[in-house]
Every structure is written in C-alpha cells, then in structure tokens.
C-alpha cells in the first residue's frame, strides 16, 4: 500500500507496479488523497482512480485499489463509473476501499465540504447503497462492472462502521492494529455479520512495514522510514528481518487476519518491494 499523496510520480508508479508483479505480490493499493500528510503542499499527488486506470492497462495480474476513497471527494455516480471503467480496463482486477474521510486540512485546501463525522457517516452509507445499485440494478448505468468489484470498508471496528460494512461490503479492513486488537475487532465484525444473517466478511489489516534481508539492511530502512515519516524512534507494526517479519505476520494470521496490506512509505525504495515478495513467499 503506497501513500500516493507523498510525491509519487507516474514514473514511480510504473516502477512500483512492475516490481510488485515481478516480486509475485498479489496487489498494489494506494491512498486517495490530494494533499500530502507529511509535507503539506510541498508534495504532489496524482488522482487515485486515474492512476489505477492507467496502471490497469500496464499490468497483467495485480489487484489494484484504494485504501480508501473518501465519500467527500466525488458524487457516488462519478466514483462508481471511475471504478467500473478501471475494472473493464483491468479485466476484473479492481477493488474499491471507501471511507468517510478524515483529513480536514485537505478538504479546506481543495474546497471540499467537511461536515461533522455523523454527516460523513450518513454519506458513506448513502454512497455504498448508491454504488451497489449502480453496479447491480440501475438501468441507466452501463456497462456493469464484471466481475463486480469488491467493496472494502474499514476502521477500528466501531459500531456504525461495522454496521455499514455488514450491509454493503465484502471485506472489513482494520488499520495499524496489534494482533490482540485485530482479534477483538474481528470478533465484533463477525458478531455483527451473524446478527445480520450473512456470511462473515473477509477480515484484513493495513499496517506499516519495514523489512530487511539482514540487520544492516533493516537498520538502513528504519532510518529512512523515520526520516520520511518525520518521527524519530517510530517503527511500524511489521518491522524486522524477513524471518522476524514472517513470525509477526503469523501472529496476525492466528488473530484472524486473512489478508494484509503492508504500507510502504519510501516509494523510491523499489528493492523493498522485492523484499516484501520474498516475505510473502515465506508465509504463503
């Protein structure tokens, strides 16, 4: 998972996508922001769905999607059409992560409304319902995306987000959580699904990662991570040599996590993508 708002150029995206395919990774997900979180207006950002559509034409097997597209950016018909277009270009490899939006400074900078969280949650539910209708039954919305893109909703498993996910989504994605927190959050999602009389959602995790093939490589990457992040002393939940990171991922698997999206903050470090591919083979 790449933070596209942190100055990731088209050349970077091409290199990252090629590395993901070569390394054997399942997918390449990106954030959907217009303003840098770390550097404010000093870093550029390409539009998420334009980027995904372009990458869909340049890749062969990678899953592509957002974590997550804010409902405050686009009307639901525009978002549904953008995703459906990318789905056709990709031959069925696109997934939509969608959320209520949180980055107030970004909304102010670009002129988006940023209502209170309750209103944003109302809009999330409205857009989920509208997108499902546009993709499935609305007679005016053609072509229908086939297969239907998976819908991902996530957060920290608070009641309202879980209810929305259970009504409309295929997957619940929690973020930056320990294995113990994942176990608790999965239990809440599963309980809500049972109460609604539906099958369990796929339960996934998005969290940061810094890995190295040995401790020297790892130390270099940790130093670079802290420089990019601007927070000395901070390390992500999945940090270590390949063997150490594999052991950590097995802890998440034991806690009920079925899929992991590892956040890669240093988009110029393409070699770490290959290291993540080696890590994936260790735990497959």
Annotate each PLM feature:
Residues 1-284:
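Active-site-adjacent structural elements that line small-molecule/cofactor binding pockets in enzymes
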């Amino acid at each position: 998972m790449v933070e596209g708002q942190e100055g990731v150029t088209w050349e970077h995206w091409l290199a990252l996508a090629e590395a993901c395919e070569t390394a054997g990774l399942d997918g390449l997900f990106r954030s959907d922001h217009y303003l840098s979180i770390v550097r404010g207006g000093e870093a550029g950002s390409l539009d998420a769905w334009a980027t995904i559509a372009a990458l869909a034409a340049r890749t062969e097997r990678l899953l592509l999607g957002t974590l997550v597209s804010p409902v405050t950016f686009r009307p639901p018909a525009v978002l549904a059409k953008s995703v459906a277009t990318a789905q056709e270009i990709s031959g069925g490899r696109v997934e939509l992560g969608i959320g209520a939006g949180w980055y107030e400074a970004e909304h102010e900078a670009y002129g988006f409304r940023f209502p209170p969280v309750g209103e944003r949650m109302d809009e999330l539910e409205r857009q989920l319902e509208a997108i499902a209708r546009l993709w499935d039954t609305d007679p005016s919305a053609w072509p229908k995306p086939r297969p239907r893109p998976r819908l991902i909703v996530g957060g920290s498993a608070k009641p309202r987000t879980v209810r929305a996910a259970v009504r409309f989504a295929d997957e619940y994605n929690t973020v930056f959580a320990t294995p113990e927190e994942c176990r608790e959050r999965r239990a809440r999602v599963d309980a809500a699904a049972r109460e609604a009389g539906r099958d369990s959602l796929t339960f996934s995790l998005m969290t940061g990662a810094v890995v190295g093939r040995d401790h020297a490589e790892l130390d270099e990457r940790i130093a670079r991570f802290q420089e990019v992040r601007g927070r000395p002393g901070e390390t992500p939940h999945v940090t270590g040599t390949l063997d150490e990171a594999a052991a950590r991922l097995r802890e998440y698997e034991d806690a009920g996590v079925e899929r992991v999206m590892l956040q890669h903050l240093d988009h110029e470090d393409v070699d770490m993508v290959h290291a993540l591919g080696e890590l994936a083979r260790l735990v497959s």
